[in-house]
């Protein structure tokens, strides 16, 4: 490991300061045998540590009290200088094998703000210099909203199925939406609502609230799976509601048929009788013009028993 050395003439002039500086540098770098260095008279190791000594000498160099030291190349631990030439213009101590990395910081000169000695030293277009690392225009892992909606439709679909509490689904970017806690592949999150959470169609909305004998919520096959934004959603019109009622009746018939039950009546009129048999005694309308009496599941089980 190398040290900071100085010219013999300057070293004789500031022998005490150079000795103290060498001891501080060796102590800071952990050089073997630094504890046996000869300190100037009146200075003891117990009075101040190496960091305080370096700061003290650095302040003296800026004030002009301590003479400036000359940085030499090729100095080893035993202070043998194999190549005592000065550093070339634009060359730093880091470029020379065997020199100290902090050599330029302790030369004693007041470093003023300004351009370097060689302005093209770190330029990428200079021959022999390593090209600079150029970052991409957009960081990796960040995708556009349209790309997220097209590549991760299954994620948005699961979010839309999880939110069935109300007709108006919250926007993707809001904190009330379940999509706010969704982390897409790559660590990204859905940002805006350009490709938002798909809400239920009129048919799905009506059937999910009017079906009877339903054990669990079931999606109607062949429904519209289009993806719309939150701003373009509208409540169902009268035609969509009528279509939803017909679909609801069809679904009730299919589910009751699978369960072995009779289909409920497809009428909007009130039920005149809730008993297992008809007639005026059971509450049927006079003249037998009332709707057929439905057989509900609990009544069928009671009759079979």
Swiss-Prot record:
Keywords: Transposable element. Residues 255-305 are annotated as: Disordered. It comes from Streptomyces fradiae (Streptomyces roseoflavus). It comes from the Bacteria. This is Uncharacterized 32.6 kDa protein in transposon Tn4556. Residues 276-288 have a biased composition (Gly residues).
